[in-house]
């Protein structure tokens, strides 16, 4: 089969935003205008096509990112058919992992902001994640019909708060109830969408007289930004003072692809104004799979290789999401980077080193699916029938093995104990938790060694609430949930040199393992670093990995209070062995003994998750809010002006002090203040609190 749409006419984009910026509504409108859904789904009616889990429809938030394929020809049918793959990403901070996964496989993004609340904390998180993966993006300032909506104020915040370089290509005509339409600064015409047919048709009109001056000022900014794309354009602009429409568009595209500028548009998805213009901008300015750098990976011999977006290259794809579907079982969402694969083809999972077979391939349209026979470079689709694939695995051609860059996932910060209500629930709970953990790498399941309780940990209270809710609904498991616990960690601040000796020699086959280890802190975030400096074969090669295993096992069970130990560098530099009695087990135990002893001598400390907290409050309550944050061991980082005279307080607060904060804040401010929080880093716990934690854990 030949390719239906040339790859340069593909756009793989994500729609990202803060909770409530109107991201799902925007995606719904896109599906409506591209002809996929005949009735527009409203989020507040719980009928949006992209939000297909029951919990999403009830809570009005998007939890999993659904991938949808649509086609677009332009507002005036000025383009050939372009295939747009849209991934709708959740905006709630507990689901940052979903955003991270989506950005990893996208070529471009549309970031949606609310016209009245502007740049909010989660917007900064999404923006930083997009920076990390160098994703070219554009901005849609939505909800221009809302009270307090101000497009240029939001553009200003994007510049100052996000450090970006926004270039508006539109201006709004009117705002709040009087929002009429937008001015296209390239054509210098006003676009007026017809309300009678839900904005399907529109007319170009002259710019209102009172806005001509403002439009000309912003038009000049736009042309200047375009001229900076190259010296030739700059010379032409300086000589003639103008560029052609085609030159402007080409230049803006080039600078967007280089992440030098971010084009800004505005509208109101709910009022059906401005969304088609966003689609046009996606096609004109965001990259196709061949406009972004080739993905890098490593081959079997650890050499770096590149895979280009080309059907003739060997097949390579990244599994970026696993979802359980009520009808077909497990769906593995993949982004194909190179080559072609057909249904029934065998592929190789290079991370797990296992062969897999593509049973069926489906293209998702929100929660409807269409079976297809093949996928090609640039496609995003879901495969059915893959047995052992987890998020972040690479699927490739078994003759051309490659491991594409792995994704990094955040450490969970909050933990609760769950207990099945009955014997029947026990077995079902194990299966349910296993499936849910396979879908979501930021959710972990473990068993407490002492109490035998099942502990689940995640990115926040909402995250775990939804997991428990899904166990009940999808797997009909009833369970009792304990109080949330903070996921503390341990590390060392000093150095130590220690001996670990495990000897049992009382007749018959004995045990003999003997090691000398240096312990010191590794770089923050580096995890466990093991260095082998054994010389002269004092410990045989085959036992060295056992020493590392022993250390790692002891790290997982902690030394001070039983919490996992982070960021340690262990150097094995000496030891001895016995010809008969030495074994892998003996050296593993010796390594574990040495680590426990050494860590206790190297100034061990307990770490706690610090959260970045932003509280938005009327000025009258500012003193109370700041006083309360200080009582919670918070560090106030700064204050900003919010909309409508509200104040924004930015602070770092330990997670352990934030339980129940929502209720306390509501009662302290008569419900007028709101807050958001996200994980920032692990920091050392003050001595008095550390002592209390150790005592409570009975160490």
UniProtKB/Swiss-Prot annotation:
Pfam family, one: GTP_EFTU
GO biological process, one term: ribosome disassembly
Principal location: cytoplasm
InterPro entries the record matches: EFG_II, EFG_III, EFG_III/V, EFG_IV, EFG_V, EFG_V-like, EFTu-like_2, G_TR_CS
List of residues binding GTP: 17-24, 88-92, 142-145
Matching PANTHER family: RIBOSOME-RELEASING FACTOR 2, MITOCHONDRIAL (PTHR43261:SF1), TRANSLATION ELONGATION FACTOR G-RELATED (PTHR43261)
Record function comment: Catalyzes the GTP-dependent ribosomal translocation step during translation elongation. During this step, the ribosome changes from the pre-translocational (PRE) to the post-translocational (POST) state as the newly formed A-site-bound peptidyl-tRNA and P-site-bound deacylated tRNA move to the P and E sites, respectively. Catalyzes the coordinated movement of the two tRNA molecules, the mRNA and conformational changes in the ribosome.
Protein family per UniProt: Belongs to the TRAFAC class translation factor GTPase superfamily. Classic translation factor GTPase family. EF-G/EF-2 subfamily.
Protein name per UniProt: Elongation factor G
Source organism phylogeny: Bacteria, Pseudomonadati, Pseudomonadota, Gammaproteobacteria, Vibrionales
Gene: fusA
